[in-house]
């Protein structure tokens, strides 16, 4: 009786494990470490590129000739490579929100390189963003719901995901060819929407390339199909990155780098998590407590980002607040 019960329990555990694979603690730690470093590197890219654009405008030359702009571009490439490695190690919903750490880092860097203001509320926002990121790490799912190339192909052909991609493509065409030429230079949300919607392609493509590469490297029977899938995803990823790169630089030419970085994080993260939820179904392994924890963490990060940006023009510090309190007394 006991043996039969144990066998049944083992079978149930095996069946549950088929749909979700939990990476080893070492893999999770490594993936988180790479994601954190990548977010900091990515946080510096907008600032360095903006600095290069400003320097080039002063000289009356193209920013393509400025070494600081190229430093920011190289940093962006390094950050994206780091994200690719992180996505192959841990779930997307664990990596993407950590981009929040790049926002306060970029704001601090911008206060030195671009002389942008960072008052006491901005510093509080930096603290909240970091605290919210920790909450996200604690409550994010640690198991993978898609672990093979065959599962990935099945998810990619899911009617819900195909419908979502069609809507995204339609919105991108509308934004790029109609709205952006007329309103892009005056409305920051136009360029941010284009770059963020493209995240619906870049992040799932990156994750998919990692899964397909496993079959290719292990020379599985399905390696030929995996190679074709990998090439298609590489093409999608390459096109998405090129378009993103173009509109990020357009935005930096017209708007404050910190404001762009902050709003971009919130919109990009929201859309990427939506695309990942539809494609990879990683949220299916999240309980109510963890879901609420992630919602609170993301809200904390968003509030921190708002504090960094919305109140950046307010000229006050703790000394002035103490003086006003003394006068009141």
Curated annotation (Swiss-Prot):
Q: Give residue ranges on the Cytoplasmic side.
A: 49-66, 110-117, 181-183, 246-259, 312-329
**Which keywords are on file for this protein?**
Cell membrane, Disease variant, Endosome, Hereditary spastic paraplegia, Ion transport, Magnesium, Membrane, Neurodegeneration, Transmembrane, Transmembrane helix, Transport
Chief site of localization: membrane
Tissue-wise expression: Widely expressed with highest levels in neuronal tissues.
Topological domains, Extracellular: 1-27, 88, 139-159, 205-224, 281-290
The UniProt GO MF terms for this protein read:
magnesium ion transmembrane transporter activity
Its placement in the membrane is given as: Multi-pass membrane protein
What are the subcellular locations of this protein? Answer: Cell membrane; Early endosome
Q: Which GO terms describe its biological process?
A: magnesium ion transport; transmembrane transport
Q: Output the Gene Ontology cellular-component terms.
A: early endosome; membrane; plasma membrane
What reaction gets catalysed by this protein? Mg(2+)(in) = Mg(2+)(out)
Explain the purpose of this protein: Acts as a Mg(2+) transporter. Can also transport other divalent cations such as Fe(2+), Sr(2+), Ba(2+), Zn(2+) and Co(2+) but to a much less extent than Mg(2+).
Which disease does the record tie it to? Spastic paraplegia 6, autosomal dominant: A form of spastic paraplegia, a neurodegenerative disorder characterized by a slow, gradual, progressive weakness and spasticity of the lower limbs. Rate of progression and the severity of symptoms are quite variable. Initial symptoms may include difficulty with balance, weakness and stiffness in the legs, muscle spasms, and dragging the toes when walking. In some forms of the disorder, bladder symptoms (such as incontinence) may appear, or the weakness and stiffness may spread to other parts of the body.
Q: Which family does it belong to?
A: Belongs to the NIPA family.
- Specify the protein name: Magnesium transporter NIPA1
């Amino acid at each position: 009786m006991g043996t039969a019960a144990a066998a049944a329990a083992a079978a149930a555990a095996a069946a549950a494990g088929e749909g979700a694979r939990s990476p080893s603690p070492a893999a999770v730690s490594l993936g988180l470490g790479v994601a954190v470093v990548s977010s900091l590197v990515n946080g510096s890219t907008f600032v360095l590129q903006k600095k290069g654009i400003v320097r080039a405008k002063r000289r009356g030359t193209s920013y393509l000739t400025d070494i600081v702009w190229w430093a920011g571009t190289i940093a962006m490439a390094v950050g994206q490579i780091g994200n690719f490695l992180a996505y192959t190690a841990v779930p997307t919903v664990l990596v993407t929100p950590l981009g929040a750490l790049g926002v306060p880092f970029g704001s601090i860097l911008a206060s030195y390189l671009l002389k942008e203001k960072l008052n006491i509320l901005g510093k509080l926002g930096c603290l909240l963003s970091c605290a919210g990121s920790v909450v996200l790490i604690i409550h994010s799912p640690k198991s993978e719901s898609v672990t093979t190339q065959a599962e990935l192909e099945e998810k990619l052909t899911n009617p819900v995901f195909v419908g979502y991609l069609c809507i995204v493509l339609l919105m991108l065409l509308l934004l790029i060819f109609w709205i952006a030429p007329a309103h892009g230079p005056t409305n920051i949300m136009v360029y941010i929407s284009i770059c963020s919607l493209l995240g619906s392609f870049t992040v799932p493509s990156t994750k998919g390339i990692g899964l397909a590469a496993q079959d290719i490297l292990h020379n599985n029977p399905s390696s030929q199909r995996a190679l074709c899938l990998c090439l298609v995803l590489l093409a999608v990823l390459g096109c998405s990155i090129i378009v993103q790169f173009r509109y990020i630089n357009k935005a930096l030419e017209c708007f404050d780098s910190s404001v762009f970085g902050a709003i971009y994080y919130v919109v990009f993260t929201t859309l990427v998590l939506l695309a990942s939820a539809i494609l990879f179904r990683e949220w299916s392994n999240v309980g109510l407590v963890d879901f609420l924890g992630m919602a609170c963490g993301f809200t904390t990060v968003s509030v921190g980002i708002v504090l960094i940006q919305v109140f950046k023009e307010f000229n006050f510090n703790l000394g002035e607040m103490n003086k006003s309190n003394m006068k009141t007394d």
